[in-house]
Amino acid sequence: LTNTWLIYALGGGWGHLNRALALGRIAAKDRKVTIITNSPYALKINHENCIVNYISEQAGFSTTCQQVREIILSTQCDRLIIDTFPRGLGGELADILPQLQAIPRILIHRDINPDYVTAKNLRSFVAQNYDTVIVPGEGQDLPLADLPNVQHTAPWLIRNCEELPDRMSVRSHIFKVNPDIKTILVCAAGNASELSFFAQLTLRLQQNFPQCAVRILAANCPADIPEALWISHHPGIECLAAADIVVGGAGYNTVYECAAVGVPLVAFAFQRLYDRQAKRANQVYRVQNIQQAITTVSTLLDRIEVTRNLSMPSYINGAVQALHYISA
């Protein structure tokens, strides 16, 4: 056995890459883990002992598909793990998966638009081409969650609770904030095109809550944001855990990381081609515009005790559960 796991994690934003790293870093203790990604964020962060095959997001559609196929067909692996898109983001896996019957093929079933599932006849494709389907904490109400080979785990997180740094040290060293000041963190994950919206949101929050510290967590510093407000830190969960309130989108990482560390999330549900942020946003404080966000933050601030930040969060990391299912 080569004892190599190959993880397909193509797709925008942080979610696909972060899930791959959450699983890959614990799997890599006992085997080689290779991740295929086209997330530009992959160039900025620690690869957690995984080998990252980066395909430029500037590469055209056919080039990307070709590169993916070449990597998969030339990698000797004993697990092939596909995140979210059963046929690949561009359908590039549709004809190669049936050739790989000898390798256990695992689908990570993040929520996905049911119209896409129907249009591409994914139900029968998954039934024929995947040995196991793992739902990473997204609940029962998913298009493929009733297939017979489905396993459910808690959400996948890139840090176990005992690995998180002390909240107060994050506040002082990373946020550069006094421990007794309430902190509002804007989490600018998602698409680069949304960065200017998050910047505007950050400035409005700062105007409205001068008694609080407001920070923006983003891979790149937005144009109109003073450098003192900007935080670039990966993994983001270490920062979310140290905030009093998080304001962001309703993507996979933001929602489940905030839930795990017990910090309230005020969230905008952004439109995505395949993801249903609106469905996930039902679990958090959903808002439609900046004014609603300000009102909601104001209400939450009245309820929050700063002392909460002294306790360490406790949660189950679904990536650890998934490791057992996949290696079985």
Predicted regions and their residues:
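Nucleotide-activated sugar donor-binding and catalytic core shared by glycosyltransferases
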Residues: 1-214, 221-328
